Amino acid sequence: MSEKKINLLDLDRKAMRALFADLGEKPFRADQLMKWIYHFGVSDFEEMTNINKVLRQKLAARCEIVAPEISSFQKSTDGTIKFAIHVGEGQEVETVYIPEDDRATLCVSSQVGCALECTFCSTAQQGFNRNLTVSEIVGQIWRVSHFLGFAKDTGDRPITNVVMMGMGEPLLNLANVIPAMDIMLDDFGFSLSKRRVTLSTSGVVPALDKLGDALDVALAVSIHAPNDELRDILVPVNKKYPLQEFLAGIRRYIAKSNANRGRVTVEYVMLDHINDSTEQAHELAKLMEDTPCKVNLIPFNPYPGSPYGRSSNSRIDRFSKVLMEYGLTVIVRKTRGDDIDAACGQLAGDIRDRTKRLAKKRMQENQISVTMN
């Protein structure tokens, strides 16, 4: 059996340089290779013209550059594109491209499914399957960039911002998310500014501290409720890491972060008559009193079977005005891609059904195996 090749998309620059040292090559050769991969979208070693033929042959013998494939895509009337990305074994994740006048953002997944069971989120209904590898995370950016078109002559890339807000909780896959984000930030990787890479978390506090020790990126925090009683229901991880513990972790992170410019983005989904009253707005403002932040109010995006409804515009407006009375910066997020189920909280769709079928098949196979043994 031939030895499995190393997928170079799994390696950040430190790991790439270690590989090249093992090949008897100087570190700058690793940097050259990364530039070909991430600046120009090249996956064929023979196209890497400033790398000598002998090294190209060594690389081809031991390594490969393989990104997950696009299974299908849907384009919204507002230009948003939702991609189903095949990650092997019948599994898919969703990645969303959001074009705007001054930027082009890619919403990237970190897991197949999610284990946190937030009750307003479609992805939670899928359940958790597995963590994505580094190559499957950065490969979403690489593959969508190919779809949109790398400018191979200039190295200009079509994606300016990345948000880790797709399927999964990034902090539960820290071992792969950190090197993946390192590649996003690296000058020889996707070369994105740390203010243009955002990680969103529901509050896995110990992992948030580890992230702060490893990387500096923009942070968005999923609060969604002004007190522990309601948040225990909406975001069950709150039972393990309640609000005050989460907020303390947030303050520790932004204290050592330059990317956040001294404040964090609070995400708050607006659920009709659940968390959107005037009293709850006052409660949220007081909760965030000691945590510098701007608040992003997210109109809920319904999905089939959801127990919640979207807050009316008038309730969102009242809620927003109360927060602003406390001096908070408030943004009401414009819903993008909801006609193709690509909006916040809607990711899963047909993928949920396919994943459940796969899990059922695996369970049946395991039962057969146990019976035979």
From Swiss-Prot:
Main location: cytoplasm
Catalytic activity: adenosine(2503) in 23S rRNA + 2 reduced [2Fe-2S]-[ferredoxin] + 2 S-adenosyl-L-methionine = 2-methyladenosine(2503) in 23S rRNA + 5'-deoxyadenosine + L-methionine + 2 oxidized [2Fe-2S]-[ferredoxin] + S-adenosyl-L-homocysteine; adenosine(37) in tRNA + 2 reduced [2Fe-2S]-[ferredoxin] + 2 S-adenosyl-L-methionine = 2-methyladenosine(37) in tRNA + 5'-deoxyadenosine + L-methionine + 2 oxidized [2Fe-2S]-[ferredoxin] + S-adenosyl-L-homocysteine
An example Gene Ontology CC term for this record: cytoplasm
Location of the active site: E94 (proton acceptor), C344 (s-methylcysteine intermediate)
Coiled coil: none
GO biological process terms, semicolon-separated: rRNA base methylation; tRNA methylation
Gene3D superfamilies reported for this sequence: 1.10.150.530, Aldolase class I
Cystine residue pairs: C107-C344
Residue sites binding [4Fe-4S] cluster per the record: C114, C118, C121
Keywords carried by this UniProt record: 4Fe-4S, Cytoplasm, Disulfide bond, Iron, Iron-sulfur, Metal-binding, Methyltransferase, rRNA processing, S-adenosyl-L-methionine, Transferase, tRNA processing
Annotated S-adenosyl-L-methionine binding sites: G168, E169, S200, S222, I223, H224, N301
CDD domains cross-referenced by the UniProt entry: Radical_SAM (cd01335)
Alphabetized InterPro entries for the sequence: Aldolase_TIM, Methyltransferase_A, RlmN_N, RNA_MTrfase_RlmN, rRNA_lsu_MTrfase_RlmN/Cfr, rSAM
Physiological role: Specifically methylates position 2 of adenine 2503 in 23S rRNA and position 2 of adenine 37 in tRNAs. m2A2503 modification seems to play a crucial role in the proofreading step occurring at the peptidyl transferase center and thus would serve to optimize ribosomal fidelity.
Family: Belongs to the radical SAM superfamily. RlmN family.
Leftover remarks: Reaction proceeds by a ping-pong mechanism involving intermediate methylation of a conserved cysteine residue.
Protein name, as recorded: Dual-specificity RNA methyltransferase RlmN
Organism annotation: Shewanella putrefaciens (strain CN-32 / ATCC BAA-453)
Designated gene of the protein: rlmN
